[in-house]
Amino acid sequence: MRRRKAPVREVLGDPIYNNKVVTKFINKMMLDGKKSVSEKIIYAAFDKIEEKSGEKGIEVFEKALERVKPLVEVRSRRVGGATYQVPVEVRPARQQSLSIRWLLEATRKRNERTMIERLASELVDAANERGAAFKKKEDVHKMAEANKAFAHYRW
């Protein structure tokens, strides 16, 4: 384990919207250090969303992230030889990183032709409470609800 807690580094806002969450999404989507490719994809997806739905791409993005954020999750805890799935609340920073991760996983698994189309579709779906990322959040919440009896094992 670490001696000290790792310092949380501040990210700068992205070049167009000056939004830190968009920057985090761009960084998480980036493969092989190709940040410019990642930026092009996300901005093109925002344009595609505006084209399709008439809503601003950044607003749909923020709504999608908000809808995918988990409030509770389960953590494994061993008690006397048995492993229990204990429901715990999710801290805000983890809520954000999980929602970004789930949106990207769901986007990469979609069947549309280009990443731009996949990302745009997944963001619109998540904003409208459908899609794989939203389903993932619902599944996590169901697991926590099902294991509510073990909540007293929290740490």
From Swiss-Prot:
Tell me which InterPro entries the record gives: Ribosomal_uS7, Ribosomal_uS7_bac/org-type, Ribosomal_uS7_CS, Ribosomal_uS7_dom, Ribosomal_uS7_dom_sf
Instruction: Kindly state a single biological-process term from the GO annotations of this entry.
Output: translation
Keyword tRNA-binding listed? The answer is: yes
Identify the keywords attached in UniProt to this record, alphabetized.
Ribonucleoprotein, Ribosomal protein, RNA-binding, rRNA-binding, tRNA-binding
Molecular function terms, GO-annotated = rRNA binding; structural constituent of ribosome; tRNA binding
Q: Which GO terms describe its cellular component?
A: small ribosomal subunit
CDD domains assigned: uS7_Bacteria
Entry keyword annotation includes tRNA-binding: yes
Q: Which Pfam families match?
A: Ribosomal_S7
HAMAP family from the UniProt entry = Ribosomal_uS7_B
Which protein family is named in the record? Belongs to the universal ribosomal protein uS7 family.
| Listed PANTHER family | RIBOSOMAL PROTEIN S7
Whom does it interact with, and what assembly results? Part of the 30S ribosomal subunit. Contacts proteins S9 and S11.
> Could you tell me what this protein does?
One of the primary rRNA binding proteins, it binds directly to 16S rRNA where it nucleates assembly of the head domain of the 30S subunit. Is located at the subunit interface close to the decoding center, probably blocks exit of the E-site tRNA.
Give the protein's recorded name.
Answer: Small ribosomal subunit protein uS7
Taxonomic placement: Bacteria, Pseudomonadati, Campylobacterota, Epsilonproteobacteria, Campylobacterales
